[in-house]
Amino acid sequence: ETRRLLEIFHAPKENLVFIHAISGTKGLEWEVAKAIVELSKLLNAKQIISLEGVVSPDNAETSRIFVKSNDYKSEKELLKLGAEKLDRGAVTGVTGALMLTTESVNSTFLFAETHSRMPDSRAAAELIRMLDVYLNLKVDPKPLIKQAEDFENKIKDMIKLGIDSQKPEDDESQKVNYLG
């Protein structure tokens, strides 16, 4: 069975390369991180930008974005755009390995605060918003926000169906009105 660990997308007009490290790479994080660093050097990339989600116990409507960078200028610019500095925390997986192997390449790590253990389109939209301004991409995050709303409504409907199915039925035919 062939397993893809990376998906690579190239936007030639903007000279951007997007690399998606597939989750579930346990045990291969270092090899994937090394491949990303090698590719960035091969392409003479100005910067590696890593996007990640971080679970938050808060139920806020919007997601905060945290930044950690080995490039002072990039970090300063992202802080001006509203990101908060990531000072501590445990980062694992490909992102954690990248953080430890990118000293020779300008690297910036953005973490979107998610409010569930499921995919969070609102958090993704916040990341897109920040990247849009930072890189001047002109990308509209509205489709992600719409997707988040649709997903949330489906979850609410499923929860309501589950609650409704647990309620006792008030069916007259089920009542015994005599003994005999």
List each language-model region with its residue ranges:
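Short, basic, glycine/proline-bearing loop/turn elements
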Residues: 15-25, 80-84
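Histidine- and/or cysteine-centered catalytic micro-motif in compact active-site loops
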Residues: 22, 52-54, 112-113
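Catalytic cores of processing enzymes, dominated by hydrolases/peptidases
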Residues: 57-134, 178
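N-terminal short beta-loop-beta anion/metal-coordinating cradle
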Residues: 1-21
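Hydrophobic/aromatic beta-strand patches that form the interior of the parallel beta-sheet core
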Residues: 17-19, 49, 106-111
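Solvent-exposed alpha-helices and their adjacent loops that cap or buttress functional pockets
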Residues: 8-13, 41, 100-103
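Extended, histidine- and acidic-residue-enriched regions that form the cofactor-binding/catalytic faces
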Residues: 106-180
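Internal, conserved structured core segments that host functional sites
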Residues: 14, 26-74
